[in-house]
Amino acid sequence: MAKNVRIFHCSPEAVFDVLRDGWLYPTWVVGASRMRGADPGWPAVGTRIHHSFGVWPFVINDTTTVLERDEPRRLVIQARGWPVGEARVEVEVEPHPRGCRVTLRENPVEGPGSLVPGFIAQPGIWFRNRESIRRLSWVAAGRAANA
């Protein structure tokens, strides 16, 4: 499972302010290119956001579903990206003297992507999520500073 950790200069609540707004998903998730909709009540367990991934005009429409939510500490989602497959993504947020410590874990769980050996897949996932967690930190801290 690819794991990325970063110290954010904002509160755990500020991180969840971003996670609660499904429309912000493409601003911080590398590869997500646009939002098409969010279920009422997002991010309640079982709700979905409807997004696309890829580079226009080569985009694929799919969804991400909330599996677990323990705000402001933890959000677990299942991101679909067929034909590549699906991944379980965990976002854990802990208080830290400088704001909060965010851990992002991702593991392919369904489809062809889950058949790729970890030692091949995980470095690429880690590299992509390094940028995703960086973007999430900027969005959360920026929104908190302007609140």
Model-inferred region functions:
Residues V18, W28, V59-I60, E86, ...:
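Alpha-helix N-cap/helix-start motif
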Residues N4-R6, T64-T65, V91:
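Residue-level detector of beta-strand structural context in well-folded domains
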Residues R36-W82, R88, H96, R101, ...:
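Glycine-rich portal/gate segments that line the openings of hydrophobic small-molecule binding cavities
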Residues E13-F16, R130, R134:
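Amphipathic alpha-helical segments that line or abut small-molecule/effector binding pockets
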Residues A79-E131, A147:
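Beta-strand/loop substructures that line and gate deep hydrophobic ligand-binding cavities in soluble
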Residues M1-A44, N146-A147:
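Hydrophobic ligand-binding cavity/cleft-lining segments
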